[in-house]
Structure formats: structure tokens, C-alpha cells
Amino acid sequence: MKLPIYLDYAATTPVDPRVAEKMMQCLTMDGIFGNPASRSHRYGWQAEEAVDIARNQVADLINADPREIVFTSGATESDNLAIKGVAHFYHKKGKHIITSKTEHKAVLDTCRQLEREGYEVTYLQPEPSGLIPVAMIEAAMREDTILVSIMQVNNEIGVIQDIDAIGELCRSRKIIFHVDAAQSAGKLPIDVQTTKVDLMSISGHKMYGPKGIGALYVSRKPRIRLEAAMHGGGHERGMRSGTLATHQIVGMGEAAAIAKADMVVDNERIARLRDKLWNGIKHIEETYINGDVEKRACGSLNVSFNFVEGESLMMALKDLAVSSGSACTSASLEPSYVLRALGLNDEMAHSSIRFSIGRFTTDEEIDHAIETIKESIGNLREMSPLWEMFKDGIDLDSVQWAHH
């Protein structure tokens, strides 16, 4: 067993060896190294064919037309291209956007930028379960609403939003619907023929593909128009100029194909390991699961251990690679904005740990994780005066703390 045990699959996944092998064939003089846009010789044709195959593999994952797949540098760029692209193209129709407070920073910060440009954004507050009711979205819609952007699976708590129902609502109101599917593509079955999604962001490195590559699904029926953010040679039907990175794209395509083929088997195993982990630690006193218990992605477990500081717990769990939020915000000492939006107080938000399980997690690793967590929580609480007060029956919320 390799230490530390990797339980941070929501931050990134290792590249599947089958994917790495495919990528290696697109780099050197012996491989498919040409520029896919070079139409005058075989090196270019071979690269173009490799990209076409990968485009079909990514399209197959979500049941899209390959012409609806635009390759980007990752889900962050896809989110930016979708939201800014729609806002700038349809600005004469309206300048109002609806999103939620628990979206990824790539969506929230893009919306903040649009606010600086004169757009208006409504940030919806989810229920304590993390779910956003469709009625709440409907109530926020206005005559000038042009876009709704709601993620399918939350990166911190793993809850699954009902994008089918939200899509129906948006389509009936003729409002464009964007879904950030970075955490769900390759893990949940997605069918854009039945789910009324207009734009969908996908990440390569969240599904055992390489970093630095992503895709944006752009619907053709109904046709969605975007204003490009990257200008140049007119690649990707003018939506995203720049020489296509064949090896990255081939890697993402192969990762998508494997994810589609292995999804059911992978998910059953991952869900079993997640349940094993939760059943192993849920009996620890004052331990709470964050987010809806039923509607959640199979690999995700966000747990608050009351009276334990998250940072000190992470240091105590040195044999486990876990996080106290998303990788994009864990550098800040602020409590998770996602957990705060669910109504957790600062103390509970600070005492939470995100465990995310994936394709290469083993039973042995989960057993070791359970023992490590139990031991660490016990040790930290023994040192905690707050835990002692709580055990003595003192209501900590009623205590008047002196400020020195």
C-alpha cells in the first residue's frame, strides 16, 4: 500500500495507464505529431484523424454530435467561454444571469467579471441539503434573463442537481442553460438528446485524462451562438482558435471512452468503498455528513468533525491525501464558501474534510483510512478544551467569550 493514500479524486485524477499509452503515440517523430490543421501532407491528415476519433469519443460520452464538441484548455476555460460567450453575443436580448452560490469559482468569478461589465447576476442560495429547487430558479427568472448556469455535481459536497428539470424549465422560457459537468462527465450517465442542456463544460483531468484539456458542448439544435474569447486561426469552428494539442485531445478521448465502458462497474465499486468509509467513521461522536445523502455522486464524502479544526486534522491525517474544500480555494484560510452557503457555521465549516474516492482506491486503503481517522479525531479531541466543555454539558453557543 502506497502512502499517503490518495483520497482527493475530486481535485484531480491520475492519468489511466491506457490513456498515457495512447498519448505517447502522438508526440515523437515516430508517432502522430503533425498539426491537425496541416491539410497538405500525411502528418497533418493523421493528426486530424486522431483528433476526429477523440472528438467522437467525447461526444459519445454525452450522446452529442461530434460537431457540438469544442476543445478547450480545461473546464475553467469552457465555463468562461460559455458564460462570457453567451453574455456578449446575446447582450441585446438581456443582461441578466442566474447561478448559485455553490458553483465552482470558474463560474462565480466569470459572473463577477460580467457584473463589472454591467450585467446583473442573481446568486441563488441552495437548501441546507445543497440542492437548488427548480421553483427557486423559476422565481428568479425575468424578461431579460439570458442564461442559467448550474453545475451538475458539486465539487465539494458531491450533490447532484436535477438538470433534467432545470433544462425543461429553461427551454420552456427560451433561456440558455449552461451546466458545469466537470465532476459528473464520465461518472454519471449524461444524454444531451434527452436532457435539455445548451452548453456543458467537461474536464479531462477529472476523468483519468491529462490536465490542460477540456471541452465545451455547444448545442446545434437549438443553435447556440457564442462570441469567441480566443482569436486567431479560426480553429474549432471559430469558437476557440489555437493549434489543437493532439496528444492531450487523444488522451481525453481515450479517457472518455474508458469512462463510458467502465462506468457501471467503476461506480458500483466506488460507491461500495464510500459507504464502507462512512460506515467506519459515522459512529464517531459529533460527526456529520454535508450535503444531500441520497442525491450525491458515488465517490464523494464531505464530513464535519465537530470540535476539531480542519487544518490540524489534515496535518494529523498525514497518511491520507484529503482536502478541506476544493483545491482552487484550499489555499485560503476562509471556511468553505460552499459549506457556509448550506448554513454551516464557521466552526463546522472549518472542521470539515472532503474525502473523494476513485478508480484506483482499494479496500485496504479504506480500512487504513478508517483507523487513521478514528485515532486522529480521538487524539485531537483529547487536547481540545472545547470538547471537554461540550462533554461536561456546557452549551458552547451560550458562552460569552472574553476578547483579549
UniProtKB/Swiss-Prot annotation:
Extent of the signal sequence: none
Residues at which pyridoxal 5'-phosphate binds: 75-76, 155, 183, 203-205, 243
Keyword Iron annotated: yes
Keyword Iron-sulfur tagged: yes
GO cellular component: L-cysteine desulfurase complex
GO MF term list: 2 iron, 2 sulfur cluster binding; cysteine desulfurase activity; metal ion binding; pyridoxal phosphate binding
S-S bridge residues: none
Active site annotation, chain numbering: 328
Modified-residue entries (N6-(pyridoxal phosphate)lysine), positions: 206
EC code(s) of this entry: 2.8.1.7
Name of the top EC class for this enzyme: transferase
Subunit (UniProt): Homodimer. Forms a heterotetramer with IscU, interacts with other sulfur acceptors.
NCBIfam families: IscS (TIGR02006), PRK14012.1 (NF010611)
Main function: Master enzyme that delivers sulfur to a number of partners involved in Fe-S cluster assembly, tRNA modification or cofactor biosynthesis. Catalyzes the removal of elemental sulfur atoms from cysteine to produce alanine. Functions as a sulfur delivery protein for Fe-S cluster synthesis onto IscU, an Fe-S scaffold assembly protein, as well as other S acceptor proteins.
Family that this chain belongs to: Belongs to the class-V pyridoxal-phosphate-dependent aminotransferase family. NifS/IscS subfamily.
UniProt protein name: Cysteine desulfurase IscS
Gene: iscS
